[in-house]
Amino acid sequence: MNFIINSPLEQFTTRVYFGLSSGLINLDTITLTSFSIYSIAVVALILGFSILNDNNTNILPTRWSLAFESLYFTVEKMVSEQIGGLEGRLLFPFMFSLFMYILIANVVSLVPYSYAINAQLIWTIGLSVAIWIGCTLTGLANHGAKFFGLFLPSGTNLPLVPVLVIIELLSYIARALSLGLRLGSNILAGHLLLVILAGLILNFISISIFTFALGILPLSILLGIVALESAIAFIQAIVFTILTCSYIKDAIHLH
């Protein structure tokens, strides 16, 4: 196992730390990678956050409780407005878990030299494709052939039907990629910007004492970008969850 990081860009590289092998059975596919380690860490942080939120023995809520409840009610309002009804209540645990996983993974990746889970496009696109397939199967199971009416807006003139059906169909298929691509590309671009700027600033302040003193200005700019990336981490989790709710709503209510 090699835990030494030689380059900041290695936060985007999936590394294998441990693997099982046997002369009788091929176990090479059973490996412990940086992706799995950070995924376990993210889940552990979510569970720890939930435990800290346990406010049953306190009269006044703690800061952790207020923060967790704010996130909880934000997602609950989102699901009730987008989906609503019994379906919304049944799907809320999934939507809240999805939101928390993306949010915590984004925040963890802001730690210098940490692994950026959501910068892996194969993961984010794979997640969005799985959600898209689930929404499509839900729509077909609930509505049968009527589900295809989603591709034909009501009141469409007959000559425009073929064109609009093709456009709506392509737009629907693009959801499978756009949902994950939006998340992955935003996280990847933001982290690359931080890595490049941090490297340039480090080289600049290492030249002399004079440049070290001048480095206060670019360092303040870098801190501002870090704050911006922190906001983007939250916004991307919100956007991913809202769009997932919207896709599920289309599958359930056909509008």
Swiss-Prot record:
Positions annotated as propeptide: 1-6
Keywords per UniProt: ATP synthesis, CF(0), Hydrogen ion transport, Ion transport, Membrane, Mitochondrion, Mitochondrion inner membrane, Transmembrane, Transmembrane helix, Transport
The record's annotation in SUPFAM superfamilies points to:
F1F0 ATP synthase subunit A
Instruction: Note whether Nucleotidyltransferase occurs among the keywords.
Output: no
Name the family the entry cites.
Belongs to the ATPase A chain family.
What function does this protein fulfil?
A: Mitochondrial membrane ATP synthase (F(1)F(0) ATP synthase or Complex V) produces ATP from ADP in the presence of a proton gradient across the membrane which is generated by electron transport complexes of the respiratory chain. F-type ATP synthases consist of two structural domains, F(1) - containing the extramembraneous catalytic core, and F(0) - containing the membrane proton channel, linked together by a central stalk and a peripheral stalk.
The record's section on PANTHER family has:
ATP SYNTHASE SUBUNIT A
Q: What is this protein called?
A: ATP synthase subunit a
UniProt organism field: Yarrowia lipolytica (strain CLIB 122 / E 150)
**The encoding gene:** ATP6
